[in-house]
């Protein structure tokens, strides 16, 4: 919607309609102390465009961009190469919106893109269907928990200790209002996740088991075992994928028995961009189709028998009675979904596998190099492109010391789990196809200096 300025005559006409003699009279109900009567003290006057550009450039020079230093951060947001073609394509006027294509007769291009996106997500996840996107991975995770509750008529969700703590906190926030019980635990610094302990906590009141794949420490759980145990108790397995590139080499969660698969699509096409906006991915078995949150784009034929695309299901509160809605999602992450779809299309199946192999190789090189540093232990026995190291003392300070040496060395578990003293020395390290041998050498050298 374009900004249309108002003239004094426009304002007078509007005030006349509502029966107010002036703008001050219109806002008379607002306490005087809450109204702005003069310029804000200390706020500078306007400046020229060139002066503002220079000022903003000076401020931005204080930032450290992901590509300017050795970068090993991950834990749910990853630095991958995004081809320039992606940004070029999403800036086309036909696509540059996140808004819902309510009128199929004038939105066939957008609807077809969403249909193709759904197909790609379903194939990636190994599920029968996928929706047209959600806001991000954490909200998609909660939507899956809520969906499992509707399906099973149960109110207790079992969350694996390997689930990202921010996803857990998002679920806790929502559960405060829904009354759902969340059975949670913190991860333990072990080479592999304790799947047997998780399975032992499943009972007849469990609606779903939520497992991250790979988990927050980079470990790879046995989804088939957990799926069998959950389904034997009448519960659903929800698998959370925060790094979809991993599915270029790992078996898809759906093929391993997951009932619902959700994830964060940031790795493909979206970029880090200061933490958002990101992209929620959601897929499930076809028999749960009518419980899926958000929107589903489908293929049909028009009155002339020509192929067309429409919003087949939109069981959200704007479309149906609130008490019957499966979700209150509003406009979805359509533009981010387009970027994801373009990037994945450019890669193709073999390209995604190559990207995954390069990321895995970079992580293996990094882990091998760090294992040679005195005082550092690589915790994981198996991993994709992310692993955890145990450091000789508090990892938060070590991360800060590395940053002072212009190396972004990892995410400290003390930051993610500030109440868990047993995790304070842990640091999660990620590598991708962007990681070079020089980056690895710089990390090793900086760590040796910090730990000396």
Curated annotation (Swiss-Prot):
This protein's record includes keyword Oxidoreductase: yes
Transmembrane segments: none
Keyword set includes Protein biosynthesis: no
Documented EC number(s): 1.4.4.2
Reaction(s) this enzyme catalyzes, per UniProt: N(6)-[(R)-lipoyl]-L-lysyl-[glycine-cleavage complex H protein] + glycine + H(+) = N(6)-[(R)-S(8)-aminomethyldihydrolipoyl]-L-lysyl-[glycine-cleavage complex H protein] + CO2
Gene3D superfamilies linked: Aspartate Aminotransferase, domain 1 (3.90.1150.10), Type I PLP-dependent aspartate aminotransferase-like (Major domain) (3.40.640.10)
Keywords assigned by UniProt, alphabetized: Oxidoreductase
EC class name: oxidoreductase
GO molecular function: glycine dehydrogenase (decarboxylating) activity
InterPro entries: GcvPA, GDC-P_N, PyrdxlP-dep_Trfase, PyrdxlP-dep_Trfase_major, PyrdxlP-dep_Trfase_small
One GO term (biological process): glycine decarboxylation via glycine cleavage system
NCBIfam families (alphabetical): PRK00451.1
PANTHER family tied to this protein: GLYCINE CLEAVAGE SYSTEM P-PROTEIN, GLYCINE DEHYDROGENASE (DECARBOXYLATING)
Similarity-based family: Belongs to the GcvP family. N-terminal subunit subfamily.
Subunit structure: The glycine cleavage system is composed of four proteins: P, T, L and H. In this organism, the P 'protein' is a heterodimer of two subunits.
Functional description taken from the UniProt entry: The glycine cleavage system catalyzes the degradation of glycine. The P protein binds the alpha-amino group of glycine through its pyridoxal phosphate cofactor; CO(2) is released and the remaining methylamine moiety is then transferred to the lipoamide cofactor of the H protein.
Protein name: Probable glycine dehydrogenase (decarboxylating) subunit 1
Organism of this sequence: Novosphingobium aromaticivorans (strain ATCC 700278 / DSM 12444 / CCUG 56034 / CIP 105152 / NBRC 16084 / F199)
Lineage, uppermost ranks: Bacteria, Pseudomonadati, Pseudomonadota, Alphaproteobacteria, Sphingomonadales
Gene coding for it: gcvPA
């Amino acid at each position: 919607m374009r900004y249309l300025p108002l003239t004094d005559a426009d304002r007078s006409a509007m005030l006349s309609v509502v029966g107010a003699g002036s703008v001050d009279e219109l806002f008379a109900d607002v306490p005087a102390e809450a109204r702005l009567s003069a310029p804000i003290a200390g706020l500078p006057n306007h400046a020229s465009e060139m002066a503002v550009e220079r000022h903003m450039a000076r401020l931005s020079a204080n930032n450290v961009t992901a590509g300017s230093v050795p970068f090993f951060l991950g834990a749910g947001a990853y630095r991958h190469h995004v081809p320039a073609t992606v940004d070029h394509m999403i800036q086309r006027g036909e696509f540059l919106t996140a808004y819902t294509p309510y009128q199929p007769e004038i939105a066939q291009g957008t609807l077809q893109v969403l249909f193709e996106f759904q197909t790609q997500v379903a194939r990636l996840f190994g599920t029968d269907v996928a929706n047209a996107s959600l806001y991000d991975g954490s909200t998609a995770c909660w939507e899956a928990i809520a969906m499992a509750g509707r399906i099973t008529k149960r109110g207790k969700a079992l969350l694996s200790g390997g689930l990202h703590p921010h996803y857990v906190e998002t679920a806790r926030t929502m559960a405060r209002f829904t009354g759902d019980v969340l059975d949670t635990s913190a991860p333990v610094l072990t080479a592999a996740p304790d799947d047997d302990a998780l399975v032992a906590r499943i009972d007849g009141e469990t609606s779903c088991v939520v497992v991250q794949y790979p988990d927050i420490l980079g470990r790879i759980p046995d989804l088939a075992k957990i799926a069998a145990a959950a389904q034997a108790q009448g519960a659903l397995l929800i698998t959370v994928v925060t790094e979809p590139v991993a599915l270029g080499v790992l078996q898809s969660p759906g093929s391993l028995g997951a009932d619902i698969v959700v994830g964060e699509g940031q790795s493909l096409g979206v970029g880090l961009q200061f933490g958002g906006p990101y992209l929620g991915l959601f897929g499930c078995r076809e028999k749960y189709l009518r419980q899926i949150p958000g929107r589903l784009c489908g293929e049909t034929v028009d009155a002339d028998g020509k192929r067309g695309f429409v919003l087949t299901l939109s069981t959200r509160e704007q479309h149906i009675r609130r008490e019957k809605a499966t979700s209150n999602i509003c406009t979805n992450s359509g533009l981010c979904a387009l970027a994801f779809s373009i990037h994945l299309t450019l890669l193709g199946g073999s390209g995604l596998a190559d990207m995954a192999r390069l990321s895995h190789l970079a992580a293996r090189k990094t882990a091998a190099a760090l294992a040679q540093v005195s005082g550092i232990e690589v915790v994981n026995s198996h991993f994709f492109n992310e692993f955890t190291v145990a450091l000789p003392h508090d990892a938060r300070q070590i991360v800060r010391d590395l940053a002072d040496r212009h190396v972004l060395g990892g995410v400290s578990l003390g930051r993610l789990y500030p109440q868990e003293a047993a995790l304070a020395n842990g640091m999660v390290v990620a590598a991708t196809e962007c990681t070079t041998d020089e980056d690895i050498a710089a990390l090793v050298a900086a760590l040796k200096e910090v730990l000396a």
